[in-house]
């Protein structure tokens, strides 16, 4: 978890829930004052965000858990997300930069070393779910952009050609990357 995301959110007057699987990163950012709130409860994370938005109070919330769980929860609970990005280390998805859903950070680390083929299979399955959740949210009005972390390329490599224009990663992807306003 970067400290830049939650700090930028609060500076801009917004509300954000930022997922992170590594508790030590959350603890560091919270101790440094870069993120305001910490929870491992999705209902609590979104309730805090809604309360802050309703009162026009900036808030940054670190959710200790997997981003796919967070996004699938938002889909299931019909929670609108205005702006969505992803900062997982997808440039190194199979080297530990991406945590498969259903695994703790520690389980991810162990599986990466003990069973890399199974780790890769789980990463691919999770990337597919990640894409489907984003696609559903975008269909409901969420604006998603790639943070320049190779997320869309990783999804394509995981076996999802529909993330690419014309089904080929040579023609670009369906979501924008590195957005400026």
Where do the PLM segments sit?
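Conserved divalent-metal-coordinating catalytic cores
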Residues: 49-51, 58-63
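Polyanion-binding loop/helix "lid" in catalytic or ligand-binding cores
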Residues: 61-63, 125-129, 136
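A structural signal for short, well-ordered beta-strand segments and their strand-loop junctions
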Residues: 18, 62, 83-86, 143-149
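Active-site/ligand-binding-proximal alpha/beta "capping" segment
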Residues: 60-88, 95
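Glycine-rich beta-alpha junction loops
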Residues: 23, 65-68, 87-92, 148-154
